[in-house]
Swiss-Prot record:
KW Transferase (keyword) present: yes
Record bears the keyword Transferase: yes
Pfam families in UniProt: NodA
Subcellular location: Cytoplasm
Matches recorded under NCBIfam families: nodulat_NodA, PRK00756.1
Source organism, top-level taxon: Bacteria
E.C. number(s) listed in UniProt: 2.3.1.-
Protein name per Swiss-Prot or TrEMBL: Nodulation protein A
GO molecular function: acyltransferase activity
Gene Ontology annotations for the cellular component aspect, listed alphabetically: cytosol
Family: Belongs to the NodA family.
Gene encoding the protein: nodA
Function text: N-acyltransferase required for nodulation. Acts in the production of a small, heat-stable compound (Nod) that stimulates mitosis in various plant protoplasts.
The entry's keywords: Acyltransferase, Cytoplasm, Nodulation, Transferase
Length: 210
């Protein structure tokens, strides 16, 4: 899961100022993509110039392209974002339909306000998609943050000790076409209980991460 987040507790004034919009990808116009691309460059840039490179021009996605986005706005424009894509993954060879979450970011000037808590706005949309599970991956260092965001509310289960194989978003002459990462897996039980998530330590995306 491409992710740029704040780690502090949310202030009530910050929460009430954001207006959320759920947008299907076909609903976005060129101006929307341009605004989102600028938002992602500013959000991911502080984490490293390489992380901001995918958003050059008007490109508003980094790897796989989302089909649904939750976008938070305030008077200054885009404030926060999370994307969603339905796809099949393999868990130790078992096919599973999931709604993958990614492109998770908060505007840099709001770091310290914890507006990332408002990403829970996506959960009702997840429940309406008819998929068994929501799925995402984050760095292990973000375990405490994700536990505060979704784990304590019972929205998701966090799993460690899992390796995820993905393709690069493009073909690079100096890189392997496959990425293998040791990550923290975030699972949202939707149509099926968490006990029906397949056991396994290898997840294959067979495509780039969201």
């Amino acid at each position: 899961m491409n992710i740029a987040v704040s780690r502090s507790a949310e202030e009530p004034s910050a929460r009430t100022q954001v207006q959320w919009s759920l947008r299907w990808e076909n609903e976005l116009q060129l101006a929307d993509h341009a605004e989102l691309a600028d938002f992602f460059r500013n959000s991911y840039g502080p984490t490293g110039a390489f992380n901001a490179q995918p958003f050059e021009g008007n490109r508003s996605w980094a790897g796989a392209r989302p089909e649904l986005r939750a976008i938070g706005y305030d008077a200054r424009g885009v404030r926060a974002h999370i994307g969603l894509l339905r796809r099949f993954i393999k868990i130790d060879g078992v096919d599973l339909l999931v709604a993958e979450l990614g492109l998770y970011a908060v505007r840099p000037d709001l770091e310290g306000l914890g507006i990332s808590h408002s990403m829970r706005v996506m959960y009702p949309a997840l429940q309406q998609l008819g998929v068994p599970f929501g799925f995402g991956t984050v760095r292990p260092a973000l375990e405490r943050h994700l536990t505060r965001l979704v784990g304590r509310q019972g929205l998701a289960t966090l799993m460690s000790g899992v390796r995820v194989r993905s393709t690069q978003p493009d073909v690079y002459p100096n890189l392997s076409p496959i990425r293998i990462e040791d990550v923290l897996v975030v699972v949202f039980p939707l149509e099926r209980p968490i006990g029906e998530w397949p056991a396994g330590t290898i997840i294959d995306r067979n495509g780039p991460e969201l």
